[in-house]
Amino acid sequence: MHAIVVCGAKQYLVHENESIFVEKLAGKVGQEIQLDKVLMLDEKIGKPYLEKAKVVCVIEKHGLKSKIKLIKHISQKHHLKRYGHRQPYTKLKVVRFIHD
C-alpha cells in the first residue's frame, strides 16, 4: 500500500514500514502520531482529502540537516558577511494505514 499525505506545507509519498524525513514536529521519540490529511490511498483519490483515512507514524528521531553556507559580499565596501543555517527535521516511520 502507498499513500500521499500532507505534513506541514509539503506532500510525501509514503509506503508501509518506510522512514520519511519531514519538517520538525512537536513530540517525543517513540510517540505515535496520526497524519489525517491524506490526498491519495492506493487508487482512492480525495477531494481534496480522503475522509476517515489516516496514516499512523512513530517518531524515530529529531535532528539537524547538514549546514548550508551563505556569503553576502559587497565589493565596493570591502564587506563580507558569512551565514550558516541548519534546518531541523523529524524522522518518521510509517506503521500502518487506517481507512474504511
Curated annotation (Swiss-Prot):
The UniProt entry, under SUPFAM superfamilies, shows: L21p-like
Keywords noted in UniProt:
Ribonucleoprotein, Ribosomal protein, RNA-binding, rRNA-binding
* Lineage: superkingdom: Bacteria
Q: Which InterPro entries match?
A: bL21-like (IPR028909), bL21-like_sf (IPR036164), Ribosomal_bL21 (IPR001787), Ribosomal_bL21_CS (IPR018258)
What Pfam families would the database entry show?
A: Ribosomal_L21p
The region annotated as signal peptide is none
This protein's GO cellular component annotations are:
cytoplasm; ribonucleoprotein complex; ribosome
Coiled coil stretches, renumbered: none
Which BP terms from GO are recorded? translation
State a single Gene Ontology molecular function. Answer: rRNA binding
User: What does the record note on quaternary structure?
Assistant: Part of the 50S ribosomal subunit. Contacts protein L20.
Physiological role: This protein binds to 23S rRNA in the presence of protein L20.
* Family label: Belongs to the bacterial ribosomal protein bL21 family.
PANTHER family, sorted? 50S RIBOSOMAL PROTEIN L21, LARGE RIBOSOMAL SUBUNIT PROTEIN BL21M
Q: What is this protein called?
A: Large ribosomal subunit protein bL21
**Which species is listed as the source?**
Mycoplasma genitalium (strain ATCC 33530 / DSM 19775 / NCTC 10195 / G37)
